[in-house]
From Swiss-Prot:
InterPro entries: ATP_synth_B-like_membr_sf, ATP_synth_b/b'su_bac/chlpt. GO terms for molecular function: proton-transporting ATP synthase activity, rotational mechanism. F(1)F(0) ATP synthase produces ATP from ADP in the presence of a proton or sodium gradient. F-type ATPases consist of two structural domains, F(1) containing the extramembraneous catalytic core and F(0) containing the membrane proton channel, linked together by a central stalk and a peripheral stalk. During catalysis, ATP synthesis in the catalytic domain of F(1) is coupled via a rotary mechanism of the central stalk subunits to proton translocation. Component of the F(0) channel, it forms part of the peripheral stalk, linking F(1) to F(0). F-type ATPases have 2 components, F(1) - the catalytic core - and F(0) - the membrane proton channel. F(1) has five subunits: alpha(3), beta(3), gamma(1), delta(1), epsilon(1). F(0) has four main subunits: a(1), b(1), b'(1) and c(10-14). The alpha and beta chains form an alternating ring which encloses part of the gamma chain. F(1) is attached to F(0) by a central stalk formed by the gamma and epsilon chains, while a peripheral stalk is formed by the delta, b and b' chains. Gene3D superfamilies: F1F0 ATP synthase subunit B, membrane domain (1.20.5.620). It is found in: Cellular thylakoid membrane. Belongs to the ATPase B chain family. This is ATP synthase subunit b. The chain crosses the membrane at residues 26-48. GO terms for cellular component: plasma membrane-derived thylakoid membrane; proton-transporting ATP synthase complex.
Length: 171
């Protein structure tokens, strides 16, 4: 019984406006949607197809980036393992070198101590010999001094002359 905007009512005797908004809006909306679907099918299809292609391209690009990132991560992990192995090797070498240097220093210090002991012993021996020689000279000088004193007191002039002559003869 109803039609589009201008509708004729069977009960009334003429044409008039249908003021029932609900009925007229639904009909108008159905007509507009039908026209849009009919006219915009190609356009909307192309638009959706292009959008789908763009999304698929972005997905492929993201997947490629993911694959390259995974490969880069794998390479970085490999390099990290190699670096850790190298660091461990260097640490072992450094410890071994430190132990060798330590032993070398200890050996050198022991040799220096022995050399110093030998030098000190030689110095002590030399000093001891010098002191003994000096004591001997002092003892001889003291003995000679006493002998001279005693001889001069006990010997007369003639006995002294004979002693001097005998001493000169033995030389």
């Amino acid at each position: 019984m109803s039609s589009w905007i201008l509708l004729a009512h069977a009960e009334t005797s003429g044409f008039g406006l249908n003021l029932d908004l609900f009925e007229t809006n639904l009909i108008n909306l159905a007509i507009i949607i039908g026209l849009l679907v009919y006219a915009g099918r190609g356009f909307l299809g192309n638009l959706l197809s292009n959008r789908r292609a763009a999304i698929e391209a972005e997905i492929r690009e993201v997947e490629e980036k993911l694959a390259s990132s995974a490969q880069a991560l794998s390479q970085a992990q490999t390099q990290l393992k190699e670096a850790e192995a190298e660091a461990a090797r260097l640490l072992v070498e450094a410890k071994a070198r430190a132990a060798a240097v330590r032993q070398e220093i200890l050996d050198k210090a022991a040799a220096d101590v022995e050399r110093l002991k030998a030098t000190a012993a030689q110095d002590v021996s030399t000093e001891q010999q010098r002191v003994l020689d000096e004591l001997r000279r002092y003892a001889v000088a003291q003995a000679l001094s006493r002998v001279e004193t005693q001889l001069s007191q006990q010997l007369d002039e003639a006995a002294q002359q004979r002693l001097i002559d005998r001493s000169l003869a033995t030389l």
